[in-house]
UniProtKB/Swiss-Prot annotation:
Transmembrane segments: none annotated. Belongs to the influenza viruses PB2 family. It comes from Influenza A virus (strain A/Duck/Hokkaido/8/1980 H3N8). One of its GO terms (molecular function) is RNA binding. This is Polymerase basic protein 2. The lineage of its organism: Viruses, Riboviria, Orthornavirae, Negarnaviricota, Polyploviricotina.
Length: 759
């Protein structure tokens, strides 16, 4: 205080002011500080001081020929004095204005191509909508965000090779352009930038912006996609936010969003198949997102999301070392623990075997809408500091932390039995059982947890069991903070292993991820996702399964045909017929399968004769495990369009319609492809197959009763006559042969006689 008073007195004297403002600075230390090194020590001051001078800019001498000495207003544009210490001219800022207005022009055709990212940004801002400004406390948390909209996802090395190839094609040095995206981009850019006069270094810099994802660790409240991050300074301050809707989307955000949706769908589907890991890999390899192979995107895209990371782990890629529980990303910041199996009793006296973490640990928990810091000891929550967007989000974080703490009062708060199952109908592990239970209803958990009086700490308040805030009391160990908890900033990736049930572990054996952690949120992808794998046919519903199954048979007819006659069991077990089974009423699956397999066997018994259309139509039904029964069917039911629809065993129906004239098949009105061969070539083999051991006597004869189906013929006694339904719904009269010797010739005569009987 004394010093300040003294200074004030000194400053009131004019002599002091004069000394401070007029005398030269001649202290060596100060001169050294401001003049040593190339680095400007006070750029703002230097700029102000320079711009106050008449000629603050230096230029090449050639400028004197290119710019007049004075402008139209008679102001001097350059000085005849040389710049001290260089061979350059001193120039006025007015010269820049003159140059911009009257200087030489050049072709601008390449500007939008080189400065593409800037032009696109201007367009997005032009069409964006800025809403009202709201003043409120901003809970910002630092997240790793993409700051560069509109980029491809090349690695720095890949991009470097592309840039060298495009900008400096004649430079020496090995460049290996291997990936598809590298080659496409190089070709495209070389064409675009032919005869480009813009400085190569600038082109290289701009190309880098276009090719490489740049991320920064920034405080964000709200949208994290790159089109929001580019206006971060306009949309959120310390105590205000401005609503904003981007005026356009960029492919990199769309890729990230679509990748997450595809990965979630694939993990969910893989979980319910017989071998989840193999299925997941098969689907990742056969899926395209926006026309690019999903596996290529996974290799390049740094998005961290549970399903995406499971897919990456399956491909043997490294992922982040943090682990996921209850939709929150946990990162241990200090402490350590050992794991031990322990049996505990729930409030319902059910025994659970849990892996207890023994030891003191601290974690950060980061979710979409809430974040927290958790300190815990063995089966005890010491402290939880949570912040979130709203009451609901905060409650979610508290439940997850309470379950994670493994405290006894949490386990005792369970009412009723725990029997949650996953999509494949397998019981969840005990920790997820507890989590699901309390996510459904946490009332008892909060009531039993206990409350404590709290001290008044800046920025922290208490929260009561009914999730209302309080300044006096709070749930034991739990506080709500105004400040968010930053996401884990490191981009370090670790080697992980994955088991066939898609559980991902680090090298110490800790589970980082499992399918239970994959969000059930459904979204609509921005880019087209093409799942070529039959396992994903059902994603678009029953109709898609039906159409896809028949399309697959027709596409692969050549191989299917050979397998049908030589190795039917292998054909029936093909995974492409799996989705179809879900359309067949459960009770009928086995019976239909038995019936169709018998029918096929009868067709096979006679060489070289079968009915293509009928085999295609009935084949998917033969895939279910068959039941041996004598049941006959003239139509088979499939559940589509919300009800059972019939496929006729003989003849067309709205579900399966084969047009003989065009040789095209329509399934539920959708084109399913064309048959390349003539289905009649071995006149409908069903007939000849059936009629082995029978004589055809002629057309239908009503005296012999209603037409029997193929299988019922076997019940006839030798010499007995009957009407029989053959082929596409025609009826003929047959008699069972009295002896078996001439069976072989039957099929040939049958074919001729059927033609006569029908015509």
């Amino acid at each position: 205080m004394e010093r300040i008073k003294e200074l004030r007195d000194l400053m009131s004297q004019s002599r002091t002011r004069e000394i401070l403002t007029k005398t030269t600075v001649d202290h060596m230390a100060i001169i050294k500080k401001y003049t040593s090194g190339r680095q400007e020590k006070n750029p703002a001051l230097r700029m102000k001081w320079m711009m106050a001078m008449k000629y603050p800019i230096t230029a090449d001498k050639r400028i004197m020929e290119m710019i007049p000495e004075r402008n139209e207003q008679g102001q001097t544009l350059w000085s005849k004095t040389n710049d001290a210490g260089s061979d350059r001219v001193m120039v006025s800022p007015l010269a820049v204005t003159w140059w911009n207005r009257n200087g030489p022009t050049t072709s601008t055709v390449h500007y939008p191509k080189v400065y593409k990212t800037y032009f696109e940004k201007v367009e997005r801002l032009k069409h964006g909508t800025f809403g009202p400004v709201h003043f409120r406390n901003q809970v910002k948390i630092r997240r790793r965000v993409d700051i560069n909209p509109g980029h491809a996802d090349l690695s720095a090395k890949e991009a470097q090779d592309v840039i060298m190839e495009v900008v400096f094609p004649n430079e020496v040095g090995a460049r290996i352009l291997t990936s598809e995206s590298q080659l496409t981009i190089t070709k495209e850019k070389k064409e675009e930038l032919q005869d480009c006069k813009i400085a190569p270094l600038m082109v290289a810099y701009m190309l880098e912006r276009e090719l490489v994802r740049k991320t920064r660790f920034l405080p964000v409240a709200g949208g994290t996609s790159s089109v929001y991050i580019e206006v971060l300074h306009l949309t959120q301050g310390t105590c205000w936010e401005q609503m904003y809707t981007p005026g356009g989307e960029v492919r990199n955000d769309d890729v990230d969003q679509s990748l997450i949706i595809a990965a979630r769908n694939i993990v969910r589907r893989a979980t319910v198949s017989a071998d989840p890991l193999a299925s997941l890999l098969e689907m990742c390899h056969s899926t395209q997102i926006g026309g690019i192979r999903m596996v290529d995107i996974l290799r390049q895209n740094p998005t961290e999301e549970q399903a995406v990371d499971i897919c990456k782990a399956a491909m043997g890629l490294r992922i982040s070392s943090s682990f996921s529980f209850g939709g929150f990303t946990f990162k241990r910041t200090s402490g350590s623990s050992v794991k031990r199996e322990e049996e505990v009793l729930t409030g319902n006296l059910q025994t659970l075997k849990i892996r207890v973490h023994e030891g003191y640990e601290e974690f950060t928990m980061v979710g979409r809408r809430a974040t927290a810091i958790l300190r815990k000891a063995t089966r005890r929550l010491i402290q939880l500091i949570v912040s979130g967007r709203d009451e609901q989000s905060i409650a979610e974080a508290i439940i997850v932390a309470m379950v994670f703490s493994q405290e006894d009062c949490m386990i005792k708060a369970v009412r009723g039995d725990l029997n949650f199952v996953n999509r494949a109908n397998q019981r969840l592990n005990p920790m997820h059982q507890l989590l699901r239970h309390f996510q459904k209803d946490a009332k008892v958990l909060f009531q039993n947890w206990g409350i404590e009086p709290i001290d008044n700490v800046m920025g922290m308040i208490g929260i009561l069991p009914d999730m209302t805030p309080s300044t006096e009391m709070s749930l034991r160990g739990v506080r709500v903070s105004k400040m968010g908890v930053d996401e884990y900033s490191s981009t370090e990736r670790v080697v992980v292993s994955i088991d066939r049930f898609l559980r991902v572990r680090d090298q110490r054996g800790n589970v980082l991820l499992s399918p239970e952690e994959v969000s059930e949120t459904q979204g609509t992808e921005k880019l087209t996702i093409t799942y070529s794998s039959s396992m994903m046919w059902e994603i678009n519903g029953p109709e898609s399964v039906l159409v896809n199954t028949y399309q697959w048979i027709i596409r692969n007819w050549e191989t299917v045909k050979i397998q049908w006659s030589q190795d039917p069991t292998m054909l029936y077990n093909k995974m492409e017929f799996e989705p179809f089974q879900s359309l067949v009423p459960k009770a009928a699956r086995g019976q239909y399968s038995g019936f169709v397999r018998t029918l096929f066997q009868q067709m096979r018994d006679v060489l070289g004769t079968f009915d293509t259309v009928q085999i295609i139509k009935l084949l998917p039904f033969a895939a279910a495990p068959p039941e041996q029964s004598r049941m006959q069917f003239s139509s088979l039911t499939v559940n589509v369009r919300g009800s059972g629809m019939r496929i006729l065993v003989r003849g067309n129906s709205p579900v399966f319609n084969y047009n003989k004239a065009t040789k095209r098949l329509t399934v539920l009105g959708k084109d399913a492809g064309a048959l390349t061969e003539d289905p009649d070539e071995g006149i409908a083999g069903v007939e000849s197959a059936v009629l082995r051991g029978f004589l055809i006597l002629g057309k239908e004869d009503k005296r012999y009763g209603p037409a029997l189906s193929i299988n019922e013929l076997s019940n006839l006694a030798k010499g007995e006559k009957a009407n029989v339904l053959i082929g596409q719904g025609d009826v003929v009269l047959v008699m069972k042969r009295k002896r078996d010797s001439s069976i072989l010739t039957d099929s040939q005569t049958a074919t001729k006689r059927i033609r006569m009987a029908i015509n």
